Design a protein with these regions (language model features):
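Acidic, polar-rich low-complexity tracts and alpha-helical solenoid repeat scaffolds
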Residues: 2, 18-309
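Bacterial N-terminal signal peptides
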Residues: 10-18
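Bacterial N-terminal signal peptides that target proteins for export
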Residues: 1-9
Length: 309
């Protein structure tokens, strides 16, 4: 996908230059076989921030300089040209390639960092798929592991924290969505509990910890409330347990009254479920007794009507 994007950018640039004039000074250099002069012009254009033209020359030179000593600097400029043009997908590939091919270069550390930074720049907002966010975190962490004394470690660490914050936003929003959909399907309340707990395992220091613990109590309470009486006692007890854990974890929370109210309602729900089940058991016993009496009466009638021999 990134190759298509990159080629499109390159072709548009060439087309624009062609329209401007077939034999401009730039075109003469581009078509020239003097690679040294072409490289010099590419660097000049880069420094002049004319990245579109510089890219065309660097693209051509990467093939001609392959295997030569000058290729190191060329590939460094090439990666940064792509970066300056906003083609972060291709740029990160080139930065990584540079760091892998020239691990002892003075620019290897910088390129390894820029590889991770390009992933960071392509990390979308929290409502979208977070594949690049995870990759950015991995790349930043790899950089820190490889260069623990680098002056860039502090910034890389901050970027990781920013990216984790985005993942936390996503996790909280997804879990809350299950809760919001509980009115349509009661099993979504249970799904909310599972999602909330899983998110806190993945992100133990999540900034939404208090809100998520509250939502866990509410989700479990509503799951129990909308269950059959035969399952309510067990499920209400889980809600009570979550409520107790909330109070222990957040003793100064502004949600304490709401949590305690849910605990009281859960306890009342258990008592009500017991009464309903007891009444059902009573009715079942009464019905069973009636059936047994009718069966006995029918048996007696059959005995009386049976003729003797």
């Amino acid at each position: 996908m990134f190759k298509i994007k990159h080629l499109t950018l390159l072709l548009l640039t060439i087309l624009t230059l062609s329209v401007a004039g077939c034999k401009s000074q730039f075109e003469k250099i581009r078509l020239s076989n003097d690679v040294a002069k072409k490289y010099q012009e590419a660097v000049r254009l880069y420094n002049a921030k004319n990245y579109s033209k510089a890219l065309i020359l660097f693209e051509d030179l990467t093939q001609k300089y392959r295997g030569r000593a000058e290729a190191e600097d060329l590939n460094y400029y090439y990666a940064y040209t792509l970066y300056r043009l906003g083609d972060y997908t291709t740029a990160r590939f080139q930065f990584k390639s540079f760091a892998d091919v020239y691990p002892t270069s003075k620019n290897a550390e910088e390129c390894r960092y820029m590889y991770a930074y390009c992933f960071y720049l392509e990390s979308p907002n929290s409502t979208l798929d977070q594949e690049n966010t995870y990759k950015a975190i991995d790349a930043m962490q790899l950089f820190i592991n490889l260069y623990p004394k680098s002056e860039r470690v502090a910034q890389a660490t901050q970027y990781i924290n920013d990216l984790r914050g985005k993942l936390e936003d996503k996790a909280y929003a997804n879990a809350k969505l299950y809760y919001d959909l509980g009115g349509y399907d009661v099993t979504n309340y249970k799904a909310a509990v599972v999602a909330l707990q899983s998110s806190q395992v993945e992100f133990p220091d999540i900034k939404y910890s208090e809100e998520m613990d509250l939502l866990t109590v509410k989700s479990q309470y509503l799951y129990a409330k909308n269950s059959f009486e035969t399952r309510q006692e067990e499920r209400y007890n889980e809600a009570i347990q979550f409520a107790n854990e909330f109070v222990e974890s957040h003793p100064e929370s502004k949600y304490l009254k709401e949590v305690n109210d849910l605990k009281v309602e859960s306890e009342a729900g258990i008592e009500n479920a017991k009464r309903v089940l007891a009444e059902i058991a009573k009715q079942n016993a009464k019905y069973k007794e009636t059936l047994e009496k009718e069966a006995k009466r029918d048996s007696t009638r059959t005995t009386i009507k049976t003729p003797t021999t």
